[in-house]
Amino acid sequence: MNPISLLFLALAMSTDAFAAALGKGASLHKPRFLEALRTGLIFGAIETITPVIGWGIGQVAARFAESWDHWIAFTLLLVLGLHMIYNGIKHDDDEEQEKPGQHSFWILAVTAFATSIDALAVGVGLAFVDVNIVVAALAIGLATTVMVTIGVMLGRVLGTMVGKRAEIIGGIVLIVVGATILYEHLSAAQ
Protein backbone atom coordinates (compact mmCIF):
# COMPACT_ATOMS: atom_id res chain seq x y z
CA MET A 1 0.00 0.00 0.00
CA ASN A 2 1.45 3.35 -0.98
CA PRO A 3 1.86 6.20 1.55
CA ILE A 4 -1.00 8.25 0.09
CA SER A 5 -3.42 5.32 0.39
CA LEU A 6 -2.19 4.72 3.94
CA LEU A 7 -2.79 8.38 4.82
CA PHE A 8 -6.32 8.27 3.40
CA LEU A 9 -6.98 4.98 5.19
CA ALA A 10 -5.83 6.48 8.52
CA LEU A 11 -8.01 9.54 8.03
CA ALA A 12 -10.99 7.42 6.98
CA MET A 13 -10.61 5.21 10.05
CA SER A 14 -10.61 8.29 12.28
CA THR A 15 -13.77 9.89 10.89
CA ASP A 16 -16.28 7.79 12.81
CA ALA A 17 -14.35 8.51 16.01
CA PHE A 18 -14.28 12.19 15.00
CA ALA A 19 -18.07 12.14 14.61
CA ALA A 20 -18.41 10.57 18.07
CA ALA A 21 -15.98 13.15 19.49
CA LEU A 22 -18.13 15.97 18.12
CA GLY A 23 -20.99 14.53 20.13
CA LYS A 24 -18.83 14.19 23.23
CA GLY A 25 -17.63 17.77 22.86
CA ALA A 26 -21.16 19.03 22.23
CA SER A 27 -22.31 17.49 25.50
CA LEU A 28 -19.67 19.29 27.57
CA HIS A 29 -20.32 22.77 28.89
CA LYS A 30 -16.86 24.07 27.96
CA PRO A 31 -14.51 21.43 26.60
CA ARG A 32 -10.99 21.94 27.89
CA PHE A 33 -7.95 20.91 25.89
CA LEU A 34 -6.81 18.33 28.48
CA GLU A 35 -10.23 16.63 28.37
CA ALA A 36 -10.10 16.66 24.57
CA LEU A 37 -6.56 15.24 24.58
CA ARG A 38 -7.49 12.56 27.13
CA THR A 39 -10.42 11.55 24.95
CA GLY A 40 -8.19 11.56 21.86
CA LEU A 41 -5.57 9.37 23.53
CA ILE A 42 -8.15 6.81 24.66
CA PHE A 43 -9.70 6.61 21.20
CA GLY A 44 -6.29 6.61 19.51
CA ALA A 45 -4.92 3.77 21.65
CA ILE A 46 -7.91 1.55 20.94
CA GLU A 47 -7.88 2.46 17.23
CA THR A 48 -4.17 1.46 17.13
CA ILE A 49 -4.75 -1.95 18.71
CA THR A 50 -7.82 -3.10 16.77
CA PRO A 51 -6.31 -3.19 13.25
CA VAL A 52 -3.37 -5.22 14.60
CA ILE A 53 -5.80 -7.77 16.07
CA GLY A 54 -7.69 -7.87 12.77
CA TRP A 55 -4.43 -8.22 10.85
CA GLY A 56 -3.49 -11.22 13.01
CA ILE A 57 -6.81 -12.84 12.22
CA GLY A 58 -6.31 -12.03 8.54
CA GLN A 59 -2.80 -13.53 8.52
CA VAL A 60 -4.25 -16.91 9.38
CA ALA A 61 -6.84 -16.59 6.61
CA ALA A 62 -4.32 -15.14 4.11
CA ARG A 63 -2.63 -18.48 3.57
CA PHE A 64 -5.87 -19.80 2.13
CA ALA A 65 -6.72 -16.87 -0.13
CA GLU A 66 -3.57 -15.45 -1.74
CA SER A 67 -4.91 -15.52 -5.31
CA TRP A 68 -7.94 -13.35 -4.50
CA ASP A 69 -6.65 -11.29 -1.56
CA HIS A 70 -7.13 -7.93 -3.31
CA TRP A 71 -10.80 -8.76 -3.85
CA ILE A 72 -11.16 -9.50 -0.12
CA ALA A 73 -9.55 -6.17 0.84
CA PHE A 74 -11.71 -4.31 -1.70
CA THR A 75 -14.91 -6.03 -0.57
CA LEU A 76 -14.24 -5.39 3.14
CA LEU A 77 -13.45 -1.72 2.52
CA LEU A 78 -16.46 -1.36 0.22
CA VAL A 79 -18.83 -2.90 2.78
CA LEU A 80 -17.34 -0.84 5.63
CA GLY A 81 -17.49 2.31 3.53
CA LEU A 82 -21.12 1.71 2.61
CA HIS A 83 -21.91 0.96 6.26
CA MET A 84 -20.30 4.23 7.36
CA ILE A 85 -22.24 6.14 4.68
CA TYR A 86 -25.47 4.45 5.83
CA ASN A 87 -24.75 5.35 9.47
CA GLY A 88 -24.02 8.92 8.43
CA ILE A 89 -27.32 9.20 6.58
CA LYS A 90 -29.66 7.54 9.07
CA HIS A 91 -31.13 9.70 11.81
CA ASP A 92 -29.59 8.88 15.20
CA ASP A 93 -29.66 11.28 18.14
CA ASP A 94 -28.04 8.98 20.75
CA GLU A 95 -24.98 11.22 21.14
CA GLU A 96 -27.12 14.27 21.94
CA GLN A 97 -28.83 12.48 24.84
CA GLU A 98 -25.65 11.96 26.87
CA LYS A 99 -25.05 14.17 29.86
CA PRO A 100 -21.76 15.99 30.56
CA GLY A 101 -20.99 13.76 33.56
CA GLN A 102 -20.79 10.64 31.40
CA HIS A 103 -17.26 11.21 30.17
CA SER A 104 -15.69 8.62 32.43
CA PHE A 105 -12.83 6.48 31.14
CA TRP A 106 -15.12 3.49 30.65
CA ILE A 107 -17.74 5.41 28.69
CA LEU A 108 -15.01 6.79 26.44
CA ALA A 109 -13.36 3.36 26.09
CA VAL A 110 -16.63 1.66 25.15
CA THR A 111 -17.42 4.40 22.65
CA ALA A 112 -13.90 4.15 21.24
CA PHE A 113 -14.19 0.39 20.88
CA ALA A 114 -17.56 0.73 19.15
CA THR A 115 -16.08 3.17 16.63
CA SER A 116 -13.01 0.95 16.11
CA ILE A 117 -14.86 -2.18 14.96
CA ASP A 118 -14.31 -1.01 11.39
CA ALA A 119 -10.56 -0.75 12.10
CA LEU A 120 -10.61 -4.38 13.25
CA ALA A 121 -12.20 -5.40 9.95
CA VAL A 122 -9.78 -3.20 8.00
CA GLY A 123 -6.95 -4.97 9.82
CA VAL A 124 -8.26 -8.26 8.46
CA GLY A 125 -8.23 -6.73 4.98
CA LEU A 126 -4.70 -5.36 5.46
CA ALA A 127 -3.42 -8.90 5.98
CA PHE A 128 -4.11 -9.47 2.28
CA VAL A 129 -2.07 -6.52 0.96
CA ASP A 130 1.56 -5.50 1.16
CA VAL A 131 1.56 -3.21 4.18
CA ASN A 132 3.62 -2.78 7.34
CA ILE A 133 0.91 -3.30 9.96
CA VAL A 134 2.83 -1.46 12.69
CA VAL A 135 3.13 1.65 10.51
CA ALA A 136 -0.51 1.35 9.41
CA ALA A 137 -1.77 0.89 12.99
CA LEU A 138 0.32 3.79 14.28
CA ALA A 139 -0.93 6.00 11.43
CA ILE A 140 -4.53 5.08 12.23
CA GLY A 141 -3.97 5.65 15.96
CA LEU A 142 -2.23 8.99 15.47
CA ALA A 143 -4.86 10.23 13.02
CA THR A 144 -7.59 9.16 15.45
CA THR A 145 -5.90 10.87 18.41
CA VAL A 146 -5.59 14.13 16.49
CA MET A 147 -9.06 13.97 14.93
CA VAL A 148 -10.79 13.10 18.22
CA THR A 149 -8.95 15.83 20.13
CA ILE A 150 -10.00 18.35 17.49
CA GLY A 151 -13.50 16.84 17.39
CA VAL A 152 -14.07 17.31 21.11
CA MET A 153 -12.93 20.93 20.90
CA LEU A 154 -15.11 21.62 17.87
CA GLY A 155 -18.03 19.60 19.19
CA ARG A 156 -19.70 22.36 21.10
CA VAL A 157 -19.83 24.58 18.03
CA LEU A 158 -20.10 22.14 15.13
CA GLY A 159 -21.51 18.98 16.69
CA THR A 160 -24.99 19.29 15.29
CA MET A 161 -23.90 20.58 11.86
CA VAL A 162 -21.04 18.21 10.87
CA GLY A 163 -21.33 15.07 13.02
CA LYS A 164 -22.85 12.55 10.61
CA ARG A 165 -21.37 14.16 7.47
CA ALA A 166 -17.89 13.24 8.72
CA GLU A 167 -18.93 9.59 8.74
CA ILE A 168 -20.29 9.85 5.17
CA ILE A 169 -17.00 11.35 3.98
CA GLY A 170 -15.08 8.61 5.80
CA GLY A 171 -17.17 5.95 4.09
CA ILE A 172 -16.50 7.44 0.67
CA VAL A 173 -12.76 7.56 1.43
CA LEU A 174 -12.79 3.87 2.48
CA ILE A 175 -14.44 2.91 -0.80
CA VAL A 176 -11.83 4.92 -2.75
CA VAL A 177 -8.99 3.25 -0.81
CA GLY A 178 -10.50 -0.17 -1.55
CA ALA A 179 -10.85 0.67 -5.24
CA THR A 180 -7.23 1.86 -5.29
CA ILE A 181 -6.02 -1.43 -3.77
CA LEU A 182 -8.03 -3.38 -6.35
CA TYR A 183 -6.72 -1.21 -9.20
CA GLU A 184 -3.09 -1.55 -8.04
CA HIS A 185 -3.34 -5.34 -7.92
CA LEU A 186 -5.18 -5.70 -11.21
CA SER A 187 -2.84 -3.33 -13.07
CA ALA A 188 0.24 -5.09 -11.62
CA ALA A 189 -1.08 -8.44 -12.88
CA GLN A 190 -1.11 -7.22 -16.50
Curated annotation (Swiss-Prot):
Keyword RNA-binding set for record: no
Disulfide bridge map: none
Protein name listed in UniProt: Putative manganese efflux pump MntP
The keyword Membrane belongs to this UniProt entry's keyword annotation: yes
Recorded topology in the membrane: Multi-pass membrane protein
GO molecular function terms listed in the Swiss-Prot or TrEMBL record: manganese ion transmembrane transporter activity
GO cellular component, one term: plasma membrane
Protein family: Belongs to the MntP (TC 9.B.29) family.
Keywords: Cell inner membrane, Cell membrane, Ion transport, Manganese, Membrane, Transmembrane, Transmembrane helix, Transport
Subcellular location, record wording: Cell inner membrane
Main subcellular location of this protein, as a coarse class: membrane
InterPro entries: Mntp/YtaF (IPR003810), Put_MntP (IPR022929)
Cited function: Probably functions as a manganese efflux pump.
Transmembrane region(s): 3-23, 41-61, 69-89, 105-125, 133-153, 168-188
Organism name: Pseudomonas syringae pv. syringae (strain B728a)
